[in-house]
Amino acid sequence: PELIEICDRIGLLVNCESFDMWELPKTDFDNARFFRETAHRDVMSWVKRDRNHPSVILWSIGNEIYDTHVNEHGYEIAEMLKNYVREFDYKCNAGVTIGSNFIEWENSQKIGEMLGISGYNYTERCYDAHHKKYPNTVIYGSETSSAVRSRGIYHFPADVPQLTHDDHQCSSLANSTVGWGKPAETAWIDDRDRKFCAGQYVWTGIDYIGEPTPYSTRNSYFGMADTCCLPKDIYYFYQSVWTDFKEKPMVHLLPYWDFNVGQPIDVIAYTNAPAVELFVNGRSQGIQHIDHEHG
């Protein structure tokens, strides 16, 4: 409750999620063993706890759910859970949705259509075709990007993808991505250029312990900030697209400059300004105007 109260105060929109599995298990001893017995009670507790919070805009009945694509029984479960949610959120304070890795399967698409609000995990490639097929279904990115980066680490050149490195760190030059993800700038454009898309939830805001990616490390590298909540460079990309130049002008330049003498380095500037001029030792290196087409 404390987390959602903070979101209420500062204006963060919450996709409030319940189940990580339904009847089909992900591990030997997970909640699938009790799902059918406890689902109604779990939904009641979940919805009644959070239904009066203005920050909650979505009730997600699951994420990465195996049942949704293997057969039509998943549709029946999804409809059951939707009805449970509506039983306790009878004023429809928030919509009912699901986050899906399996949206390319017909059964999963039908569930999204039935719910009316469908979350897509890393499947922006389906947006246009599915919007044409299901024009009345709201589409949004329930998980996007999954670019990995270490704060203050740069592996050159920027145009060479490299997920791992000898130092076991990830590059902050937008050239470290996992197989299922994409750079933050690309994921942003996928959403920005589609008026029918309701937005996206970026994976992730903050690094977290577990899911070591790349393996083997102690934690993930997905965050805009590290585990101490210190901003990485990509934090300033999101600041540049979420703020107004006329109200809060900003620019963030990377990387730092004390590399080996004579080593070519890639320079990146994140800004909400229409143009940026780069100076080295007082000498102009030219002006770059913002490229809206490519972010």
Give the location of each predicted region:
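Substrate-binding clefts and catalytic carboxylate motifs of secreted carbohydrate-active enzymes
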Residues: 55-59, 78-94, 99, 110-112, ...
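Active-site mouth of glycoside hydrolases
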Residues: 1-117, 121-138, 143-157
